[in-house]
């Protein structure tokens, strides 16, 4: 029989620092709990124990503190973000029916030692899961230790038994106490013998066997005089340290292994806790969805609508929910009903002429098109409203919104219940938008944009299939040539795509200096290869190989698979994903078509108009910097834009203290990096890496920039301070981003949050402007040039397809609409070109 005992404080600490911060909608930190549960699940899978329990420290002094006042005195206080998770973590363990053992005046290590001792006495195997090596002294024939090491995004474990311990330390596990007595332990502020480090301590134990043995042989000639003096002076501390480092397996706890035998979870209690923590994936992972039916119903804020067989034809407004199984839920003022997939497809659903409430209206309209159902006008989108209210959430399901806003418990598969929830959500979410000052954002930008995106997705864009095939063939030939070159340098064939084989070749066979190490060996990522490219000709060849294979798989082959029967690619624009409000695209992702290399830019040649047409490409010029100039109110930056001076040249003149006409191309490139780096809160280290200068020079560039653009400097300070005070930052159009991490005690987390606070108003406002431009361009084209169609939005550019004969007029219209989308204190400029491909138009 096997028992697994977790060192609760140690494991949750490692989870806290090893998992990216997570918060609930209300700002409750949850990542330590999430990480703890992941470690627990992994340990249970690996060890397959019959029993599981957890030991925690209790607040207050222990017998060690009474013996030595300085014990653990150098430890930092527990971060507040972790402290708030501790009681909830224990609630979760109780709901899982996992016993918790604690003992006032004793440490968790002593409790664990006691559990291990009792297990050994009853012939149980005991596996201790901890991140602290203190517990290694407990190893014996029945007790093993699983050491957990967590880094951000990565957790590794090592199982120590007696053999593994001897292999690493060279002596028996119990002698770990003697080792700490000699060398001390800075993490617990155990003094040890001053001047004796790990190497010397191990040498002494190897020769004399124990602390007592060392002091019994102080006159041994192998002990150097200075070391002897240190040992004599530190004898009292050595034996004090021995006592402090010794785990006492006599904690007065009521424990028997059978009490910790794995029991079924309290499913309802665990479900409710996971709901509170917003662990949606864990609810499914632990199979807790069914527990919702047993949950006491939350206070309902709405009256249920009566169930009907069908919806009367004269209903003018209704909520429509399309479930994953094809069934359709309908709700209106007097009732709710559901149609089976067959009923919906057989023409029993008529929505023409009705005012409709949808959840994710863009997707819903596509679904209705597939069913051949003509829809009326969408008047409200609940998913879109929820996204505007909390863009950082990852869950906009109807069940989640119903719980949060209505106090209703519904299943996403229940079409009728979800439709009813949508009906009741509309007034609630409308009220929330108004209360939070987001009505304009929703009504003028997000909601009308849905119809535009729906049309753009339907239109798609033509692809030159034959040219794409030829491009793929050319890449295949170049990849083959590249392989031949690489193998000639390596002296034989190997798997170029294998990180291990490539690492062995570069760092062992060819002897190149390792740049970065990972748990599996030396890294060969792009950053490493960039630093090694001048060390051996094989490195540039490998970089070319990777670039070519990426182009082949992602674009030449990937785009070919996405071409539909109409010869066009129909990407999906994701408008409920990014926290800044920017659009992204999938299937395929057209936002990352390469532009920085000549070969990558060739891909744009494959995007063509239909016969008789051209593509018009209109691109905003430096929109984020113009937004920064407006928001920050910086006079120097505003003047540069209003005078139509190249902003990067103007910045270079300011930063380097030279006349505009004397700015060199290199100075302009550096100034450009600073300009855009400031927008993203770049550090001196990152800037130095980007432009290839020292950190000292990078710091000087940033300081000179902020001294010359004082309005920007004041903005940077104020926007972060304001966000820290009110908990969020917002765009000119009222788009908010909540940033609870600004109050984190973790410097790295807090610094990242400050960069978000700095960047969000700029990037978010730019996103709002491009969305407004899309709406204006779509409406203007429909009115004046109905044969012209908006096809794509990629970052700050819009792509329109139009008859060749009106290309000049359409280009002028698109540019004009984009430039006049808002009245800022600096002009917005958009340059429009056209051609027979995206490449030509760009």
Where are these regions (language model features)?
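Active-site-proximal helix-loop-helix substrate-binding element of RNase H-like nuclease domains
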Residues: 152-180, 187, 300, 326-453, ...
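Conserved "right-hand" nucleotidyltransferase catalytic core of DNA-directed polymerases
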Residues: 234-344, 356-361, 418-595, 614, ...
């Amino acid at each position: 029989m096997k028992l697994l005992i977790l060192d609760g404080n140690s494991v949750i600490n490692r989870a806290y620092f090893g998992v990216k911060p997570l918060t609930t909608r209300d700002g409750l930190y949850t990542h330590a709990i999430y990480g703890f549960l992941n470690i627990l699940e992994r340990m249970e899978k690996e060890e397959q124990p019959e029993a599981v329990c957890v030991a925690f420290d209790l607040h207050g002094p222990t017998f060690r503190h009474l013996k030595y006042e300085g014990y653990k005195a150098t430890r930092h206080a527990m971060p507040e973000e972790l402290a708030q998770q501790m009681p909830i973590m224990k609630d979760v363990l109780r709901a899982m029916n996992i016993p918790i053992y604690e003992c006032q005046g004793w440490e968790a290590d002593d409790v664990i030692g006691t559990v291990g001792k009792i297990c050994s006495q009853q012939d149980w195997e005991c596996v201790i899961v901890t991140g602290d090596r203190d517990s290694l002294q407990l190893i014996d024939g029945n007790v093993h230790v699983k050491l957990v090491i967590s880094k951000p995004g990565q957790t590794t474990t090592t199982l120590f038994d007696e053999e593994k311990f001897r292999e690493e330390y060279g002596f028996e596990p119990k002698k770990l106490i003697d080792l700490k007595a000699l060398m001390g332990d800075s993490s617990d502020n155990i003094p040890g013998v001053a001047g004796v480090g790990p190497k010397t301590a191990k040498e002494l134990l190897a020769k004399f066997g124990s602390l007592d043995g060392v002091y019994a042989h102080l006159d041994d000639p192998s002990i150097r005089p200075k070391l002897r003096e240190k040992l004599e002076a530190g004898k009292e501390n050595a034996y004090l340290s021995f006592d402090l480092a010794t785990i006492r397996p006599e904690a007065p706890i009521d424990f028997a292994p059978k009490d910790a035998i794995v029991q079924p979870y309290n499913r309802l209690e665990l479900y409710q806790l996971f709901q509170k923590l917003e662990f949606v994936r864990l609810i499914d992972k632990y199979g807790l969805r069914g527990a919702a039916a047993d949950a006491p119903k939350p206070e309902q804020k709405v009256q249920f609508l009566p169930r009907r067989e069908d919806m009367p034809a004269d209903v003018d407004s209704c909520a429509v929910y399309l479930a994953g199984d094809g069934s359709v839920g309908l709700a209106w003022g007097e009732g709710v009903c559901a149609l089976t997939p067959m009923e919906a497809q057989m023409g029993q659903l008529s929505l023409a002429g009705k005012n409709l409430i949808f959840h994710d209206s863009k997707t819903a309209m596509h679904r209705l098109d597939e069913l051949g159902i003509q829809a009326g006008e969408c008047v409200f989108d609940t998913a879109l409203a929820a996204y505007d209210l909390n863009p950082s959430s990852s869950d906009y399901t109807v069940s989640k919104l119903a719980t949060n806003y209505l106090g209703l418990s519904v299943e996403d598969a229940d079409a009728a219940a979800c439709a009813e929830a949508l009906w009741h959500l509309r007034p609630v979410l409308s009220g929330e938008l108004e209360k939070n000052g987001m009505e304009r954002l929703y009504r003028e930008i997000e909601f009308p944009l849905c119809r535009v995106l729906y049309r753009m997705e339907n239109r798609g864009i033509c692809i030159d299939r034959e040219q794409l095939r030829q491009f793929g063939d050319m890449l295949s030939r170049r990849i083959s040539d590249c392989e031949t070159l690489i193998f000639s340098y390596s002296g034989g064939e190997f798997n170029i795509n294998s990180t291990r084989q490539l690492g062995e070749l570069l760092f062992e066979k060819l002897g190149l200096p390792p740049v970065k190490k990972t748990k599996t060996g030396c890294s060969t990522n792009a950053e490493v290869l960039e630093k090694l490219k001048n060390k051996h000709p094989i490195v540039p060849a490998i970089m070319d190989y990777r670039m070519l294979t990426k182009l082949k798989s992602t674009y030449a082959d990937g785009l070919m698979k996405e071409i539909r029967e109409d010869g066009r690619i129909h990407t999906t624009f994701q408008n409920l994903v990014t926290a800044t409000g920017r659009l992204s695209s999938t299937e395929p992702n057209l936002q990352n078509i390469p532009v920085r290399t000549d070969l990558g830019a060739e891909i744009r040649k494959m995007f063509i108009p239909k016969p008789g047409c051209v593509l018009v490409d209109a691109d905003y010029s430096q929109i984020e910097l113009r937004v920064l100039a407006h928001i920050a109110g910086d006079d120097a930056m505003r003047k540069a834009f209003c005078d139509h001076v190249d902003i990067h040249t103007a910045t270079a003149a300011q930063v380097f203290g030279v006349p505009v006409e004397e700015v060199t191309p290199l100075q302009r490139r550096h100034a450009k990096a600073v300009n855009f780096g400031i927008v993203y809160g770049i550090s001196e280290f990152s800037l130095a890496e980007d432009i290839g200068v020292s950190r000292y020079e990078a710091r000087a560039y940033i300081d000179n920039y902020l001294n010359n653009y004082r309005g920007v400097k004041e903005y940077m300070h104020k926007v972060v301070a304001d966000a820290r005070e009110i908990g969020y930052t917002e765009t000119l159009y009222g788009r908010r981003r909540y940033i609870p991490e600004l109050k984190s005690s973790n410097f790295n987390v807090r610094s990242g949050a400050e960069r978000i606070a700095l960047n969000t108003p700029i990037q978010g406002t730019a996103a709002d402007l491009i969305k407004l431009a899309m709406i204006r361009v779509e409406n203007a084209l429909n009115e004046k040039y109905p044969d012209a169609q908006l096809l794509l939005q990629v970052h700050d550019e819009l792509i329109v397809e139009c008859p060749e004969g009106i290309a000049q007029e359409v280009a002028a219209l698109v540019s004009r609409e984009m430039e006049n989308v808002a009245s800022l204190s600096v002009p917005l400029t958009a340059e429009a070109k056209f051609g027979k491909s995206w490449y030509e138009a760009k």
